[in-house]
Amino acid sequence: MLPQLQWSDEVIYVDCESSDGSLGKAEELGCKTFSRPNDRNLNVNKSFAMDQASGDWIFYLDPDERIPSELVEEIREIVASETEYSAFRLKRKNHYFGKWLKHGSQYPDIQLRMFRRGKGKFANQHVHEKLQIEGKTGMLKEDMLHYSYMNISQFLKKFDFYSSFEAGFMLEQGVQVNSINHLRYFLFRPATRFFRRYFIKGGFRDGIPGLFCAFFDALNIMVRYFKLWELKRKNS
């Protein structure tokens, strides 16, 4: 990911306890590097990175995301212009096991990633929370690429990480473990989610990766509720 970002004025790399040599590589490429604890709320470290930026515009991305050359040119044109917008959204192409998922609510996966410095912030409360923008927001034409999961082992590791964080958030929000929620989280919500993603939104058109995505998206609802139950037992 890092070499393709050399077109930018500065690259800020926040390493969250990685063990693959990424930090050293970032230092070799001249990035501004920082080491931070791997906070379960990823937005805490994103907020930290944003505070280190010195340019007029910020574009943030994760290690499994890529910016095609067409998107680079569009970004350059906007930065050089006198645009009225404070931020820009874009479409993201999600890839599971090397396949771009065009259906099942996976595309267009709208993301807000580019904004003027000082005009965007996270509340740092939840892993999936959106950037809060001061001002008008536009839309980019070109897509960003997202290689979500390259293999099953990588997927299961991320699945465990995110479901644990979401269970903790449910605990903080006061979600109860009771008979009504048993039905809600073990039956109704997973079944509805799978049916919508796989059949109504056409996830079946994406073959095995589409089935995998829809199934585990539904399973995540059950697993995070199981983990909530575990947390409550541990705290009782």
Model-derived regions, located:
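Short, well-formed alpha-helical segments that are part of the catalytic scaffolds
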Residues: 1-10
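A conserved acidic beta->alpha catalytic loop
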Residues: 4, 15-25, 38, 62
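Active-site acidic short loop of glycosyltransferases
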Residues: 7, 53-56
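Residues lining hydrophobic/aromatic ligand-binding pockets adjacent to catalytic sites
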Residues: 16, 55-56, 61, 65, ...
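Conserved donor nucleotide-binding strand/loop of the catalytic core
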Residues: 23-54
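Catalytic-site signature of metal-activated, phosphate-bearing donor transferases
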Residues: 43-50, 57, 68-235
